[in-house]
C-alpha cells in the first residue's frame, strides 16, 4: 500500500481577503462566527484567520463580552 500525503488547501484569512471587512466589537453577528457553542473563542487553526486578525478578534470579543453584547458562556 502506498501512503499518500494529503495536502490541505491553504486557507486565506477572511479579513485579509476582504479589505473592507472590519473587526469591530459592536458587530456581534460577525463575532458570533468565531465563538463556539459553549462561548469559547475559536483557535486560528479552526477559524482560518491570520495571527494579526486573530489577535484583533480576541480583543473585540473580550470587549463585547465586557459590555454585555456577547455572553461569557452559552448554556
From Swiss-Prot:
Pfam families: Ribosomal_S18. InterPro entries: Ribosomal_bS18 (IPR001648), Ribosomal_bS18_CS (IPR018275), Ribosomal_bS18_sf (IPR036870). The keyword Ribonucleoprotein applies. One of its GO terms (biological process) is translation. Keywords: Ribonucleoprotein, Ribosomal protein, RNA-binding, rRNA-binding. The keyword Repeat does not apply. One of its GO terms (cellular component) is cytosolic small ribosomal subunit. GO terms for molecular function: small ribosomal subunit rRNA binding; structural constituent of ribosome. Belongs to the bacterial ribosomal protein bS18 family. Binds as a heterodimer with protein bS6 to the central domain of the 16S rRNA, where it helps stabilize the platform of the 30S subunit. Part of the 30S ribosomal subunit. Forms a tight heterodimer with protein bS6. NCBIfam families: S18. This is Small ribosomal subunit protein bS18. The lineage of its organism: Bacteria, Bacillati, Bacillota, Clostridia, Peptostreptococcales. The gene is rpsR.
